[in-house]
């Protein structure tokens, strides 16, 4: 689906955006710590962090619908010419819904898990993929009870699958295994969100200023507290004359008017700290200004707006947040200290706090 015609007049721009895509792939392949891995450690604990990011025993976490839409909007907003290199549009996804859609997506997940890029084959048969995917979707993983396709057998659903929309959907996914599949409905929504974003003058200016260098999908690699780290920044302004750098981060959400809570619950303050530190090291002597969020509604109901952060917000990212209830959200510095402790001691099945207190701690008190 060609959203932008690649004519001679925009060939240079297209090549530049392809270069951005190549750098992004290089970024994804780099195993350095980033906001997502540090957030995983904080939210899910050291063992999950180890299995997912060190031992690579876990599949990457599935993005939420809002995050999927955010990535699509980001592409159409900042590197639209590369849409065909990143995404493919399938029509079947609009007709395959509910548990049927879940089954096809689980099949594709297993296909990718066993896929050999060199010869284009899978290490298990299609029948094995279908049966395993069906069981994964049908049965509750804890109780073993049927929660989807109740009373059905995998053989009966295979008959429905063959020659129908489900098979078309699956085939379209497999044919584009290296790309992200989206529906026409999703693309239309993303395009409308982009229009809404650019209709706000102060946001339109971010992507069209002439007095600064503008970089989209800007990769950073650096070291901090003994760790190799990385960040992929949505948009960066650099003013070499006045020596300042401004970072912008696009967030789409179902609840844009309560974004302060989203910043807390999704631990975006950690991302602010990671990116700020990377920019500080990349641009010594420059003023690194606190992040500005570009906040857009995933359903395109609420007008987009800019959410500014301050040096106080940035301090929270490094040092943590203490809530009136007593709940403490750890900052980047403390989390890196704890991660280093786990590496030094090769202990991943408990936390540093529990281990150093001989397996006895006082539980957090909430509600006061």
PLM segments and residue spans:
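Metal-dependent nuclease catalytic cores that hydrolyze phosphodiester bonds in DNA/RNA
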Residues: 2-230
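Metal-dependent nuclease catalytic regions and adjoining charged, substrate-binding loops involved
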Residues: 2-11, 112, 116-119, 123, ...
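Short amphipathic alpha-helical face segments that pack within enzyme cores
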Residues: 72, 234, 270-278
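Hydrophobic/aromatic-lined pockets within catalytic cores
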Residues: 77-82, 224, 237, 252-255, ...
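Short catalytic/ligand-binding loop motif for oxyanion handling, primarily in non-cytosolic enzymes
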Residues: 85-86, 256-258, 301-303
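Extended, compositionally biased low-complexity polar/Lys-Gly-rich tracts
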Residues: 166-197, 216, 247-259, 265, ...
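Secondary-structure boundary elements
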Residues: 206-210, 237-245, 280-289
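Non-catalytic protein-protein interaction segments used by genome-maintenance enzymes to assemble
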Residues: 218-269
């Amino acid at each position: 689906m060609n959203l932008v015609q690649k004519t001679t007049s925009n060939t240079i721009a297209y090549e530049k955006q392809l270069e951005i895509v190549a750098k992004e792939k290089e970024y994804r392949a780099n195993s350095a710590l980033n906001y997502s891995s540090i957030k995983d450690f904080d939210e899910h604990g050291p063992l999950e962090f180890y299995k997912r990011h060190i031992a690579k025993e876990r599949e990457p976490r599935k993005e939420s619908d809002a995050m999927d839409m955010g990535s699509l909007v980001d592409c159409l907003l900042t590197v639209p010419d590369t849409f065909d290199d990143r995404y493919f549009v399938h029509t079947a996804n609009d007709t395959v819904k509910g548990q049927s859609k879940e089954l096809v997506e689980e099949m594709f997940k297993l296909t990718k898990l066993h896929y050999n890029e060199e010869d284009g084959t899978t290490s298990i048969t299609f029948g094995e993929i279908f049966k395993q995917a069906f069981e994964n979707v049908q049965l509750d993983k804890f109780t073993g009870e049927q929660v989807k396709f109740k009373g059905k057998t995998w053989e009966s659903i295979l008959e429905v699958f063959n020659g129908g929309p489900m098979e078309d959907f699956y085939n379209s996914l497999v044919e584009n295994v290296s790309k992200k599949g989206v529906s026409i409905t999703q693309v239309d929504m993303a395009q409308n969100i982009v229009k809404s974003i650019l209709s706000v003058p102060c946001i339109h200016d971010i992507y069209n200023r002439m007095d600064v260098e503008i970089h989209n999908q800007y990769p950073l690699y650096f070291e901090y507290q003994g760790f190799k780290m990385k960040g992929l920044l949505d948009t960066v302004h650099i003013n070499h004359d006045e020596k300042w750098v401004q970072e912008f981060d696009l967030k789409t959400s179902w609840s844009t008017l309560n974004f302060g809570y989203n910043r807390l619950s999704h631990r975006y303050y950690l991302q602010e700290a990671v990116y700020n530190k990377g920019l500080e090291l990349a641009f010594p002597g420059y003023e690194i200004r606190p992040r500005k969020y570009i906040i857009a509604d995933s359903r395109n109901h609420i007008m987009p707006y800019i959410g500014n952060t301050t040096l106080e917000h940035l301090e929270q990212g490094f040092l943590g947040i203490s809530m009136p209830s007593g709940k403490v959200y750890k900052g980047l510095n403390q989390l890196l200290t704890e991660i280093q402790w786990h590496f030094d001691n090769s202990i991943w099945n408990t936390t540093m706090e529990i281990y150093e207190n001989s397996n006895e701690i006082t539980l957090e008190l909430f509600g006061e």
